Amino acid sequence: MVTLHTNFGDIKIKLDFDKAPVTAENFLNYCKDGFYNNTIFHRVIDGFMIQGGGMESGMREKATKAPIQNEANNRLSNKRGTIAMARTSDPHSATAQFFINVADNDFLNYRSKEMFGREVVQEWGYAVFGEVVEGMDVVDKIKKVKTGNKGFHQDVPTEDVVITSVSIE
């Protein structure tokens, strides 16, 4: 169990080591290292998700460890209250940034290889690795904050939403 202590309250997360062992261990290691302390939720979109884990106040990006393998093919869905890894367009680029789904976001799920004409297309999706077990009221407060643009970043809270510390039990 991991608790994100924020300036809005606590969010307790149960990690799924059975279905997402690499991703859960990666997140836990960042927690143990104190990496998430004093980072911000830097992207907040009501009706979608709240994203954090990589930026400090002022949108300063933190250096991360190497990317991990995408484990989205684990039958876990991006439903409300789940936590998943953020990444770039490269399916295997997740490092430290994560998001908590504030709605059911099935379009983010892994889709198996499908035949489209002569082409086989695979939708990698975003790897879910846990679920909020306490503190969805805190997540729901965060999703309502006022946002704007900061540099080339969009949907940035106008006042910092800070992960002050993380505890592990």
From Swiss-Prot:
Domain PPIase cyclophilin-type: start-end pairs: 1-168
Major place of residence: cytoplasm
Pfam families per record: Pro_isomerase
EC number of this enzyme: 5.2.1.8
Enzyme class: isomerase
Record flagged with keyword Magnesium: no
Keyword vocabulary terms for this entry: Cytoplasm, Isomerase, Rotamase
Subcellular location: Cytoplasm
Any GO BP: protein folding
Alphabetized InterPro entries for the sequence: Cyclophilin-like_dom_sf (IPR029000), Cyclophilin-type_PPIase (IPR024936), Cyclophilin-type_PPIase_CS (IPR020892), Cyclophilin-type_PPIase_dom (IPR002130), E_coli_cyclophilin_A-like (IPR044665)
Catalytic activity: [protein]-peptidylproline (omega=180) = [protein]-peptidylproline (omega=0)
A single cellular component GO annotation: cytoplasm
Keyword Isomerase in annotation: yes
GO MF annotations in UniProt: peptidyl-prolyl cis-trans isomerase activity
Family: Belongs to the cyclophilin-type PPIase family.
Function: PPIases accelerate the folding of proteins. It catalyzes the cis-trans isomerization of proline imidic peptide bonds in oligopeptides.
Protein name: Peptidyl-prolyl cis-trans isomerase B
Organism field: Haemophilus influenzae (strain ATCC 51907 / DSM 11121 / KW20 / Rd)
Gene name of the record: ppiB
